[in-house]
């Protein structure tokens, strides 16, 4: 598909990955109007582009760029592609005078930090978190290099997305073993539902000013056992190892100041949003 003159949505790079598929279903089902008007990238998508190569022409002007494209696992060399993909997106935006550019980073940049984690902090504890922090730095360097031609760019430190993370994958496969800490609870994590994510992205695309880095989560930390119960999943406990992380919590004050109030995360709400975006319990 070639964008039409009525194209008013963003260009979404990496639209065929897990998160992209969830957001596209929301768009196709009418839950995310801006996504329905978007130009969806993929090697065989609306906008076909191998991001390792120069970007082909855009026939219409999209309203901003959302970069979902990324590498989540592999060797440090493979994970370094996250920075390369970010640079490619920024160069396309600079070439065609597009913006803002929203790039998906990760709460993994906070590692084992105790929350609420703020955007001024970063202490990655694994290769993926380090790769995402390197990507953020690469974005800042590329913006400086591009100078006056640089687009506005914001790296979003994304929480777990309901329906797209390891817990929901394990639920779908009916293979869930949950760590239980000595206090009797399981891990608590920062989450965002896919519909809430889509709405926040739309708000950020229209924001007049954006910081270089921004946390993206619904307020609060959700007990994983509550998610399992809300989904009707089968699971069992195991004693939490010493290396297990009890809680990840993101500070969302800056997000609320820019995008407006975001509903506090609840297990039933997250499961409902995951199902709306196509997730199913096997």
Task: Outline where the language-model segments fall.
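NAD(P)H-binding glycine-rich loop region in Rossmannoid oxidoreductase-like domains
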Residues: 46-88
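Alpha-helical substrate-binding/gating segment
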Residues: 172-181, 188-214
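Conserved Rossmann-fold NAD(P)-dependent oxidoreductase catalytic core, especially the SDR/UDP-sugar
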Residues: 88-127
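Amphipathic terminal alpha-helices
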Residues: 1-4, 265-282
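Short-chain dehydrogenase/reductase
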Residues: 13, 79-83, 124-136, 190-191, ...
């Amino acid at each position: 598909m070639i964008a039409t003159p009525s194209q008013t949505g963003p260009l979404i790079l990496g639209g065929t990955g897990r998160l992209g598929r969830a957001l596209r279903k929301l768009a196709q089902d009418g839950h995310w109007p801006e996504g329905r008007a978007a130009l969806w990238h993929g090697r065989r998508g609306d906008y076909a582009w191998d991001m390792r190569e120069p970007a082909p022409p855009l026939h219409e002007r999209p309203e901003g760029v959302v970069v979902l494209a990324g590498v989540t696992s592999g060797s440090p060399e493979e994970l370094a592609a996250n920075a390369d993909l970010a640079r490619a997106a920024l160069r396309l935006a600079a070439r065609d005078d597009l913006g803002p550019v929203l790039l998906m980073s990760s709460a993994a940049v906070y590692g084992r930090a105790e929350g609420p984690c703020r955007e001024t902090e970063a202490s990655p504890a694994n290769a993926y978190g380090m790769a995402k922090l390197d990507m953020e730095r690469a974005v800042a360097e590329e913006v400086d290099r591009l100078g006056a031609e640089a687009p506005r760019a914001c790296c979003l430190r994304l929480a777990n997305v309901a329906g797209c993370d390891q817990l929901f994958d394990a639920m779908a496969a009916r293979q869930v073993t949950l760590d239980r800490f000595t206090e009797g609870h399981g891990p608590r994590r920062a989450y965002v539902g896919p519909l809430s994510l889509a709405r926040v992205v739309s708000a950020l695309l229209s924001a007049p000013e954006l910081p270089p880095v921004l946390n993206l989560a619904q307020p609060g930390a959700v007990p994983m056992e509550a998610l399992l119960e809300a989904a009707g999943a089968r699971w069992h406990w195991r004693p939490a190892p010493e290396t297990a992380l009890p809680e990840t919590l993101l500070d969302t004050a800056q997000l609320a100041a820019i995008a407006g109030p975001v509903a506090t995360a609840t297990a039933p709400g997250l499961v409902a949003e995951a199902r709306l975006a196509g997730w199913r319990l096997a």
